[in-house]
Design a protein with these regions (language model features):
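Short, well-ordered alpha-helical segments enriched in acidic and aromatic residues
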Residues: 6, 18-33
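Short, solvent-exposed coil/turn segments at beta-strand boundaries
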Residues: 25-26, 74-78, 98-105
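A solvent-exposed, acidic/Ser-Thr-rich amphipathic alpha-helical stretch
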Residues: 27-72
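Short, surface-exposed coil-to-beta transition loops
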Residues: 66-67, 90-96
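Short beta-strand segments that buttress and anchor functional surface loops
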Residues: 81-88
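Short beta-strand edge/turn micro-motifs at domain boundaries
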Residues: 95-119
Length: 123
């Protein structure tokens, strides 16, 4: 699979609620960084850290969260995804940047509209 196919497969797993499948595409020591200064901002090491300390909180914090992928650009082992996120309390655009090595995501940088995200998380 290409890096782009791996990344897009991850969004499919996320949309289906398949966290086990999503976790399989992350390197065990993956570096995950969420920009901003809100409760989910920061650095996560490995998928389990990301799952337990970020993803597991999303259903309660962002009810009915959905991602609409607008565009995907891949060059070499880097993939960038432009996304429109909606939830009951959120309408936001973001960019996700991935590094894929040997079939696994080793880096995942989340560039959200952190002001909108902070407002949604605090509400």
């Amino acid at each position: 699979m290409t890096p782009k196919e791996i990344v897009l497969g991850g969004y499919k797993s996320f949309a289906e609620g398949d966290m086990e499948g999503l976790g399989k595409i992350f390197h065990k020591d993956a570096y995950i960084k969420i920009n901003g200064d809100h409760e989910l901002s920061g650095t996560y090491r490995g998928f389990d850290d990301f799952l337990n300390n970020c993803l597991a909180k999303l259903p309660a914090k962002l009810p009915n969260l959905e991602a609409d992928i607008l565009n995907t650009i891949a060059e070499g082992n880097r993939v960038c995804v432009h996304i429109h996120w909606t939830a009951d309390n959120l309408d936001m655009y973001s960019i996700h940047m991935f590094v894929v090595e040997d079939g696994l995501e080793t880096e995942f940088h989340i560039f959200d509209d952190s002001q909108k995200m902070a407002e949604a998380l605090s509400g």
